[in-house]
Amino acid sequence: AGVNHNGSLEMAKEMARVAKECGADIVKYQTAVPELVVSKFAEKAEYQKQTTDAAESQLEMIRKLHFSFEAHKELKEYCDSIGIQYLSAPFDVPSVKFLGTLGLPLLKIPSGEITNLPYLEAMAAQKTPVLLSTGMSTLDEITDALGVLDDGGCPEVTILHCNTQYPTPYEDANLTAMI
């Protein structure tokens, strides 16, 4: 679900409900403190300008899309109540630590954080299995991230072969990289 709920807690809950009805086991969101991950000077991409208020900054847009920690707690409780696992990808260390308080059985590392060593150390410190997204990463960066996670005591890592272009052109899929 990411931030496709447009900042609406009710829509996020509805997405979880529909996912459960369709047979999904897990629904994934994103957790971030916007001021820690987006510069107040960052401009929006052209596609963002076309689909949101062109006059607002990237930071203002992101603030509207992300939930508070309290809202994430409520969303997790809702997911528990309907029998679907809540998962989130934290984008900063405070979000990692917050999600650690929820007792989640799994966390997800977004592609953009694979070279963020303090972040990876915080993830490993949760002692929780992780999904590691690898979009835009070199094999050396993936190897280094795995080393940080292993050294920090992360019990299990599942590597996700990712491409950050949606939809991915067939010629860029490079599925042989998985073997």
Task: Describe each model-derived feature in a short phrase.
Residues 1-179:
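Catalytic cores and adjacent flexible loops of soluble metabolic enzymes
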